[in-house]
Amino acid sequence: MAGFSDIGVFLGYLEWLKVDFYTSRPRRMQESVLKGIVKRNKNTEFGKKIGLGTVKSVEDFQKNMPFTTYEDYDEYVERMQKGEKNLIIKRKPVRYCSSSGSVGKPKIMPKCGEDLWIMQCMGFSGTTGCAAKWFRKRGVKFPKQVGNVAVVLTGHKLADGKMCNGAGQIPIAYLKPISRFFLTTPNDFMYPVDEASVNTSYFHLRFALQRRDLTYLGAMVITLLTTMFDYFEQNWEMLCDDIEKGTIDPSVKCPEELRRKWEKKLKPMPERAAEIRRECEKGFDTPIVPRIWPKFLWSYGMVGSNLKFYVDKLRKHIGDAPIHNMGYAAAEGYMAIPVELNAMDYVLLPQSVFFEFIPVDNPDCDRPLTIDEIEEGKAYELVVTNRSGLCRYRIEDVVRVTGKYKNTPKVEFLYRNNLAMNIANEKTTTQMVDWAAGETQKELGISFKGYSFCDDHDSDPVRYMLLAEPEGDADRSMLPLIEEKLDHYLCESNEKYFKYRRWGMLGAPKVLFLKKDTYADYREMLKNQGKVLNQIKPVTVINNEERKEFFFSHIDE
């Protein structure tokens, strides 16, 4: 009898048959998707407002429908949560997705059943099928899959009783009833009632280490895996002791009722503990994962071009095992999926959303291009229309076309138009950092002539640095308080920043004072280079070597 893992692989192969079918006829699929969206949502309040019912073709749609941003939907989403119907989608939303990118609160996107089904199929079956195909090509039998997914699947209910989660959590969230068949972490710790009360790194490792037959390691974002292994390097002795004795160390954060429950269930495993301890005592200069999990095959997690730094960190632990880059997904939709392991690009999914592309080198073009018109090597801002009510929605992501799979373009994510920093894939925008810096100054009664943020990859964990030129004399005694308040307001401004700080993926920010007249000197430098002064924007982000060299040479020691 086939196990759940075998069924998952079979479903993965079926999903890739569908992907091959859709990507062979992208224009026809896109026309079909748009036709269905118009038919379904034309009589909603928003659909009537923009005249969606007049659309008869792609050309009509592009000519007559306006571009939109989240501000066009915010009021409708709030009304939906109060029970109103037929506002932007005809059917009731099944649940909501939260998206980063706004100050103070995340964007909330309603999701209909069809969109959720695509997320489920691509996020779970598509990933498994891709891995199975990759190994089959290389003559490697894909064994029964059991592994660790380093994520905590919590959500929150909104006013209408519907759940709200991050988009990346949804595929695993729906598999809760059967997750014990392919995940090492029990549901008590995968789906905790109070996430803050559980040391997730400990429990993911605690249960994964017990299983010598582990075959994969996963996470929604690859940084969660590197954080987990940082914890392992620092705490392997405690973990080995607990596995040996069948205990949970008293220092580990865990609700008492769960501690009592699992200490009754856990059995001493002295032989397994000795095996892990023996390998850890050899050090971590060579990859530890294949030494403690001999059947380990692959990893998965969203990587993206901005997270290549973390791929190198993960390779220290997993060696040259392949990594599946999961997909290009957001609250707006599951837009693309890699066709191979170790790929940094993705094939667009023409059955998922209706795509439009604004050329970066011609943003004022007469009309955006469609999926069959974009060219390899060129960069485009992405515009999407989905089944869940978004119409010509500018998500502000910029992608570059890298090639084709079947007849459909493959793309790589380049950057987000409004993105300031993204050191841990938490999407911290200029709007967020400006707000956090402003609130910090306001609360402490201080003032900066100018300030700039930059990434600090040399810190462990990584963190942001604020370089600020004070008004008047610098009071160094204020630095610890400025750092504390800045951290507080960055957490308030960005839900993901807050979570990643709590999970240990981001360190507290560091603040450095700049010398007097630093920003005046910078403007003078640009003037001498022939720049027009009234076109020089504030340097909110130090994002190139020239800026880095200039500002770090002006640190007030």
Per-segment meaning from a language model:
Residues 1-53, 61-65, 76, 157, ...:
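Active-site glycine/GP-rich loop and adjacent strand/helix microenvironment
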Residues 32-96, 108, 118, 126-140, ...:
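Active-site diphosphate/adenylate-binding microenvironment
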Residues 47, 107-110, 132-148, 238-242, ...:
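Short secondary-structure capping/junction motifs at helix and strand boundaries
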Residues 81-85, 104-113, 186-189, 210-213:
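Short acidic, glycine/Ser/Thr-rich loop/turn "cap" segments at secondary-structure junctions
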Residues 96-110, 228, 511:
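Conserved adenylation A10 loop of the ANL superfamily
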Residues 110, 115-122, 323, 331:
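Long, hydrophobic, well-ordered secondary-structure blocks that form the structural core
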Residues 144-160:
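Conserved nucleotide-state-sensing and coupling region of NTP-binding domains
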